[in-house]
Amino acid sequence: MLGKFEHSSLQRLLLWMPLIALLITTGCQKRNEVIAGLEIPIPEKMTRNPDKVFDPIPGFQDGQASYQGKVAPKEIFDFYQEVMAAKGWQPTSRFARNEQDSIAYTKGNRLVLVKYNPNPDGTTVLTVMVGTQDPPK
């Protein structure tokens, strides 16, 4: 009986492996971009907006970059939850208001704020801001 159970578990595993491989290879692919000296993962389908000018948020003045692409906000959220954790970043807060979501991460004394909001044309604007946290006094 035990042999039959082990055999069926192995069969199930072998059936799921191609599906898992497909999900891994077709998921939201990434590339790394350097912002304020940090390698930050960016979804592959996002292109940089070099002329985008915005006021930095206090605490995130070290550097910023803006991107735009046809990536759903939920995909961006899931992407950053996965890749930032894999790089050792800890989520510290999440904000949602008026069609704009933000997630803040910390690693050591460095801070990263990821903001994203959908456009009416089906694209999403992604803004990444980097800062340095002052040591406690």
Q: What residues fall within each predicted segment?
A:
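Sec-dependent bacterial lipoprotein signal peptides
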Residues: 1-26
